[in-house]
């Protein structure tokens, strides 16, 4: 497998960016690559997306007409043409690495050429509120299952099966972890700092959730109480239910946090309660944008029982809007890359034309 794919893996920027402020909480930058083979229909489809925290800022799709890495956030558009040229070269190189890796992995698993197969890769870094490196990661998957992952020490690998052991031995012999570590705690961090500064108006904002509760009768004896949090940023939020002060985690239906399509997020948590006992239940909301946690209780006189078909439909639509990003994110691991070369492709130091991603062009899987 190749080591970080070009554009989508932060390339470089050796020049240190002076940090002039402290950020609230930690921040992350992640790249996701997905390659899907299409037997009889030409080259595999390759999709790359980059995220800073919960914001997608770049995207590449080999099926798109432009055949270019494209901006997905206003603050990244200020990067010059050299940056976009480099980013495009990087992802195209990664797509070719994955193309070869798909064939290699098919051989490892003794699979025929008839079926479609998928390679997924995720890598990136986190920084603390002071802008310093916290952790780095690299995870690869094949056909939706873990394949190989960089351990927390950034010096060793964990292989998921016998086939992945082959890749592990290759990468160990080529010292791939050392090269990747240099990128993760160096180049990746510098680019993340740069992006946080350039996009601070959106990336460092906190939008508190708008909350309310809805009541949905199930029968004469039971009803569902649903606690809603809408329009918040960043995505991290906690919704919990209590009955007479006791946690109801076991009985809570909790959906994953969902993008709202406007840069904010939505989430709800629900419990089924005996009719007439609604006021014994409270919903507790914690979010970075709130000065203190909120407590909500159903008040029969304050709002009527309402249907939520419209709200649910809206959430479904929002989910569809970001399907493209999810496709890449679903790849949450995998990167059986096969590249030619021996180390990450890094452009000249402090050259902003370089991408923030890295080129995984070294070892083959």
From Swiss-Prot:
Mutagenesis / variant outcome for changing residue 277 to K: In allele A*80:01
Phenotype upon changing residue 97 to I: In allele A*31:01 and allele A*33:01
This protein's domain notes: The alpha-1 domain is a structural part of the peptide-binding cleft. The alpha-2 domain is a structural part of the peptide-binding cleft. Mediates the interaction with TAP1-TAP2 complex.
Effect of residue 98 to N: In allele A*80:01
A single GO cellular-component term on record: ER to Golgi transport vesicle membrane
Domain of life according to the entry: Eukaryota
Record-listed a peptide antigen 1 binding positions: 31, 97, 108, 167, 170, 183, 195
Gene3D superfamilies, alphabetized: Immunoglobulins, MHC class I-like antigen recognition-like
The protein's name: HLA class I histocompatibility antigen, A alpha chain
Effect of residue 176 to A: In allele A*01:01, allele A*11:01 and allele A*36:01
Biased composition (Low complexity): 346-359
Span list, region VL9 epitope: 3-11
PTM annotation: (Microbial infection) Polyubiquitinated in a post ER compartment by interaction with human herpesvirus 8 MIR1 protein. This targets the protein for rapid degradation via the ubiquitin system.
Organism, as annotated: Homo sapiens
Known outcome of mutating residue 279 to K: In allele A*80:01
Effect of residue 208 to A: In allele A*02:01, allele A*02:05, allele A*25:01, allele A*26:01, allele A*29:02, allele A*32:01, allele A*34:01, allele A*43:01, allele A*66:01, allele A*68:01, allele A*69:01 and allele A*74:01
């Amino acid at each position: 497998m190749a080591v970080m794919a070009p554009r989508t893996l932060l390339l470089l920027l050796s020049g240190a960016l002076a940090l002039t402020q402290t950020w609230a909480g930690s921040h992350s930058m992640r790249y996701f690559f997905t390659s899907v083979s299409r037997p009889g229909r030409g080259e595999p489809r390759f999709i790359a997306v980059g995220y800073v925290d919960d914001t997608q800022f770049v995207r590449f799709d080999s099926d798109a007409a432009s055949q270019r890495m494209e901006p997905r956030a206003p603050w990244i558009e200020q990067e010059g043409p050299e940056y976009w040229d480099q980013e495009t070269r990087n992802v195209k190189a990664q797509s070719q690495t994955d193309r070869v890796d798909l064939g290699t992995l098919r051989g490892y698993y003794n699979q025929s050429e008839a079926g479609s197969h998928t390679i997924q890769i995720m890598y990136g870094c986190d920084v603390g509120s002071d802008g310093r490196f916290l952790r780095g990661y690299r995870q690869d998957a094949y056909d939706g299952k873990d394949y190989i992952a960089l351990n927390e020490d950034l010096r060793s690998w964990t292989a998921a099966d016998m086939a992945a052991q082959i890749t592990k031995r290759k990468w160990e012999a080529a010292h791939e972890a050392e090269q990747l570590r240099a990128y993760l705690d160096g180049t990746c961090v510098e680019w993340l700092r740069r992006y946080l500064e350039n996009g601070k108006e959106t990336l460092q904002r906190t939008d508190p959730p708008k909350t309310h509760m809805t009541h949905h009768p199930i029968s004469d004896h039971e009803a569902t109480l649903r606690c809603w949090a809408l329009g918040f940023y960043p995505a991290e939020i906690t919704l919990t239910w209590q009955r007479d002060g006791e946690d109801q985690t076991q009985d809570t239906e909790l959906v994953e946090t969902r993008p709202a399509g406007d840069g904010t997020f939505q989430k709800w948590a629900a419990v089924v309660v005996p009719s007439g006992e609604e006021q014994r239940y409270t919903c507790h909301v914690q979010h970075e944008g709130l000065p203190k946690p909120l407590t909500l209780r159903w008040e029969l006189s304050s709002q009527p029982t309402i249907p939520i078909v419209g709200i649910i439909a809206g959430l479904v639509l929002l989910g569809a809007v970001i399907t493209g990003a999810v496709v890449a994110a679903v790849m949450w691991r995998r990167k059986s890359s096969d590249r030619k070369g021996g180390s990450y492709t890094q452009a000249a130091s402090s050259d902003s034309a370089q991408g923030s991603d890295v080129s995984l062009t070294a070892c083959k899987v």
